Amino acid sequence: MTDSTIPGLLARIQRPTDVAGLSADDLRTLAADLRTAIIDTVSKNGGHLAPSLGVVELTLAMLSTFDPGKDKVVWDVGHQAYAWKLLTGRAADFHTLRRRHGISGFPKPCESEYDHFGVGHSSTSISAALGMALARDLAGDDHHVVAVIGDGSLTAGLAFEGLNQAGDMGRRLIVILNDNEMSISRNVGALSLFLSRNLSKGWARRVKRDVETALKSIPGIGDEMVAYAKRSEHSLKSFFTPGMLFEAFQFNYIGPVDGHDVKALVRNLELAKTNDRPVLLHVLTRKGKGYTPAEANPAFFHGVGRFEPETGRARKPGDTPVLPTYTDVFGETLCRLADMDERIVAITAAMPEGTGTNCFRERHPDRFVDVGICEQHAVTFAAGLAIQGYRPFVAIYSTFLQRSYDQIVHDVCIQKLPVVLCLDRAGLVGEDGPTHHGAFDLSFLRHIPHMSIIAPRDEADLQAAMYTALHLDAPLAIRYPRGVGFGIPLAESPSPLPVGVGEVLKEGEGVAVIAVGSRVHPSLEAAERLAEETGRHATVFDARWVKPLPEAQLLDIVARHDALLFVEENALAGGFSSAVLELLADRNALSGKHIRRIGLPDEFVEQGTQKELRVSLGLCMDGVGKALKELFAAVGNATAS
C-alpha cells in the first residue's frame, strides 16, 4: 500500500516508539487499522493471515514496553510478524509483501534494523535469544532480549533444548508464549493474576530468598522445610496454571494473560522486565482475531492464497479448470494404497492439511500419526515402525526434512529400512522465499548409501512412484513440487515403475536434454517448439531416478550426442546433474562434449511467484529453448571448424 492508502492512525506512526505514547482509545483504533491493512494485503498477495491477526495487541504492547532500537526481539517462525513490520517503518511498502523484490513474509535483518534475527523455520527463537542475551552480558550492555514463540513451536525439541539451557545459565531473558489453543477462564485468570502479580514481583522474590535463608539456618530440619515450602508453592501454581513446567526449567512464570488486552499485556511485560533471571510470560490469543472467516477456520487461514476479503472465499482464476495439486494426488493415492495394504502408516509433522494427509487421518485414523513439529522424531519413529514390518510414509516439506538428516542416515539408511520419505514442496515454492524453497534435498540425500530417490515428472508419475514404494525393501525418497500438475490423467490401477530406468520422450540428434522431476514437461515443450520453428530435433530424456541413475541409458544417450543440457529444480551443487557428470567422468565419457546446466545457483533464491523465479533462472520452456538454441549453435560451429 502507498502512504495514501495506509489506514487511519497507522499512517501517523512514523517510528516504532510512537506507539508508546498512544492512549488506550488510540491503541484500539490502531489495532483495527493494523487488521485492516493485514487483511487487505494478504487478500491480494496471500500469506500467513490468522497468526498475524492473533498477535496485533501483543505487538502493540511490546512496542509500548520495549525500544526495538535497543531491545532485541526474536519472532519464532516469523509468520506472525506482519503487525511488527507495519509498525517498524514498512507500512508504505507493505503492499509488496511476499512479492518479488518486495518485503519478506518473515523477519529479515537485511530488510530492517528492527528485525533482529532471521527466521522462517520453527522453534529457533529461544536458542537464538539466549545467545543474544549472553552476547549482551559479555559486552556489558543492559538491554532486554525477548523471544516470542507459539504453542505449536514449543512442541519441537529445539525449543526445549533452549529452555533447558536458558534455565541453567540463568541469564536475563524474556520468553513470551503465544498460546492460541487455550481459552481464558475467568476463575483461572483471577488466581493467575494474583500469583503472577505477586509471586513474580521483585519484593516477593526477595522475601522468598530471605525466608529460604532463614529456614535453612534451622539445625536439622531447615533444608526439609525449604523443600516443603517450594512444593507447596509449586503445587498451588501448577494446580491452576501450567506454570509448573516452566518453573521446572528454572523460569519465573507469569500468566496466563489475555493476549488481546493491551493494558494487561503492558503491565505484565513491565513485570517481566524486572526479573533478573529467565521469565516466561504466558499469553492467550485467538488465531484470526478480528476477521470472522479466519476465527471460524484458523487452520485454513494460517497460510492462505488470494481471497475475497468480504467473504473469505478464495479468488477463482477465471474459467480455467482447476487441476488437482500434487499434494491432492499424493493424499488420495496414499489413502487408496492404505485401503489395500494394512502395513501403511502415514506420518506428518504438524502439517496434515499442508501435506494432504488429512484425508488419511479421516479414513484410517488408527494408522495416522501427527508428531507435531518434530521432524527428527518423525523419521526415527518411522524407522521403529519399519523394523517391525510396517510401511511408513513420512510426508514432510522438503525444506523441513533438513532437520532430520542424522536420523535418515543413522536410523533409516544404515539399517536399510523401508521408510518412504514423501518430500512435498521440492524445488521452488514461491512467495515464502529462501527459508521454504526445497532446494537441497537431492544434494543431501543422494550420497547416502541404501537411499533411492525418484523425482516424478507429473501427477501420474507421482501416483506410480507411490505404488513403486511398496515393492522396495529399502529407503525411498519421492520428491514433488508445490502446485498443480500438468493435467495428465491418473491411472485406475498404476503399475510400479522399474527402478533405475528413465524414459526417452523425444528422439533427436546432436543435442540431448536430460531432465528430472517437474522440469521434464517444460523441457519437452521447449524441444518440440524448437523443432517446429527450426527443424532441429533435440532428444529429451526423463531420467526419473536420481538414485540409482539409469546408467546404461545415460551412457547410450551421451555417446550419441555432442551436447548435453541438464535441467533440474534443485541446487546444481551436488544435485542431479552433478550425479550424472560424476558418472560420465568416471566412465571417461565427457571428452569433447558441450555441457550446459540449468538449476538453482549457489545462492539463496529470494521470493517471488514460482513462474517469476523459474523465468529468472531459465527453468521454464523459454529458458530451456534458449539454451537449446545456443547448444545447437555451439555444435554447428564445432562441426564447421
UniProtKB/Swiss-Prot annotation:
Needed co-factor(s): Mg(2+); thiamine diphosphate
Keyword Translocase: no
A GO cellular-component term linked to this record: cytosol
Disulfide bonds: none
Residues given in the record as Mg(2+) binding sites: 151, 180
Assembly description: Homodimer.
Homology family: Belongs to the transketolase family. DXPS subfamily.
EC number(s) stated in the UniProt entry for this protein: 2.2.1.7
SUPFAM superfamilies in the record: Thiamin diphosphate-binding fold (THDP-binding), TK C-terminal domain-like
Positions contributing to thiamine diphosphate binding: 79, 120-122, 152-153, 180, 291, 375
Reactions it catalyzes: D-glyceraldehyde 3-phosphate + pyruvate + H(+) = 1-deoxy-D-xylulose 5-phosphate + CO2
Lineage, opening ranks: Bacteria, Pseudomonadati, Thermodesulfobacteriota, Desulfovibrionia, Desulfovibrionales
SMART domains assigned to the protein according to its UniProt record, in alphabetical order: Transket_pyr
Entry function: Catalyzes the acyloin condensation reaction between C atoms 2 and 3 of pyruvate and glyceraldehyde 3-phosphate to yield 1-deoxy-D-xylulose-5-phosphate (DXP).
Record InterPro entries: Dxylulose-5-P_synthase, THDP-binding, Transketo_C/PFOR_II, Transketolase-like_Pyr-bd, Transketolase_BS, Transketolase_C, Transketolase_CS
Keywords: Isoprene biosynthesis, Magnesium, Metal-binding, Thiamine biosynthesis, Thiamine pyrophosphate, Transferase
Protein's name according to its UniProt entry: 1-deoxy-D-xylulose-5-phosphate synthase
